[in-house]
């Protein structure tokens, strides 16, 4: 993304490409139209490309580890700042700032924060709900470093949760 059709065509000609495989599930209409106008046969090969992307060399694994280290550091730090009365939005904003502070280029995706009953929502969008004493908070987040992304989900309690919530958490 972010490169022009001339750049793509130039690289493909440099390699004397005749056929170009693409991820049909991930290509926008504009990108498809750009490729369609070029003198190459287009092959929808999402599975082939996905299978190739699964295999990582040592350098790629190191980049993934960097992204995970950033996310780990940001999460450890944000736990020091979570307090009763803080909103989900405030927690998300603090966390997103920490991703960058610890060396992330960006988030892997929009940070999910759900507190109390919102934690049961599959993809809780952070809202104005204030975190209450005894709430469990669910966060789903990741860091992007050099194009490589981490993804992790964590659940933690703020204050002392009731016995029933502890029992459910431990299932």
Predicted regions and their residues:
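Active-site neighborhoods and metal-handling regions in enzymes and metal-associated proteins
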Residues: 1-171
């Amino acid at each position: 993304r972010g490169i022009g059709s001339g750049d793509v065509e130039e690289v493909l000609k440099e390699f004397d490409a005749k056929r170009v495989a693409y991820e049909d599930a991930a290509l926008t209409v504009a990108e498809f139209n750009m490729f369609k106008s070029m003198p190459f046969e287009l092959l929808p090969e999402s599975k082939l490309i996905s299978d190739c992307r699964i295999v990582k060399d040592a350098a790629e694994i190191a980049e993934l580890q960097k992204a995970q280290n950033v996310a780990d550091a940001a999460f450890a730090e944000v736990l020091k700042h979570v307090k009763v009365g803080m909103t989900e939005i405030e927690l998300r904003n603090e966390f997103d700032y920490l991703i960058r502070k610890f060396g992330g280029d960006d988030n892997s995706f929009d940070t999910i924060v759900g507190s109390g009953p919102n934690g049961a929502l599959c993809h809780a969008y952070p809202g104005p709900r204030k975190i209450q004493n005894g709430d469990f908070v669910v966060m789903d987040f990741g860091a992007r470093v050099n194009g490589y992304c981490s993804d992790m989900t964590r659940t933690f309690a703020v204050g002392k949760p009731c016995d029933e919530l502890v029992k459910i958490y431990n299932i």
